[in-house]
């Protein structure tokens, strides 16, 4: 006959409460980052719609306006943050995000790209 030493159930409850808080914070972070992505993409879409209305038709292949370039950069940064948080939560399929949020290819391609002068320098 094998005997098990007694164990406290209170540890299980504490771990369960901690696990619940961690999952709750992960969900809240995903929600905040998803909203930030939606906001950034909406700003880009509004700019593009206004630009088409101003120019009276479909897009013409021209160099990117600095304001639009900033909007694409903001959207790609928001996308990158959202993808990283999802991966930290164990959600690895990015294609779902791209379809659900209707992320333009140019935003996808700039995801995770940072300009050399925008990086913080660390002192050594």
Regions found by a protein language model. Give the residues of each.
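Long, compositionally biased, intrinsically disordered regions
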Residues: 1-2, 31, 99
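Short, charge-rich amphipathic alpha-helices with coiled-coil/heptad character
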Residues: 2-20
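Amphipathic alpha-helical packing elements
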Residues: 65-112
């Amino acid at each position: 006959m094998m005997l098990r030493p007694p164990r406290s159930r209170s540890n299980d409850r504490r771990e369960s409460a901690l696990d619940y808080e961690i999952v709750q914070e992960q969900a809240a972070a995903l929600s905040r980052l998803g909203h930030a992505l939606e906001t950034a993409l909406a700003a880009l879409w509004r700019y593009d719609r206004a630009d088409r209305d101003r120019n009276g038709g479909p897009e013409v292949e021209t160099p990117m306006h600095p304001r639009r370039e900033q909007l694409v950069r903001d959207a790609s940064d928001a996308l990158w943050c959202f993808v990283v948080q999802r991966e930290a939560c164990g959600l690895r399929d990015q294609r779902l995000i791209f379809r659900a949020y209707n992320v333009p290819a140019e935003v996808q391609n700039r995801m995770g790209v940072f300009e050399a002068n925008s990086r913080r320098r660390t002192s050594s």
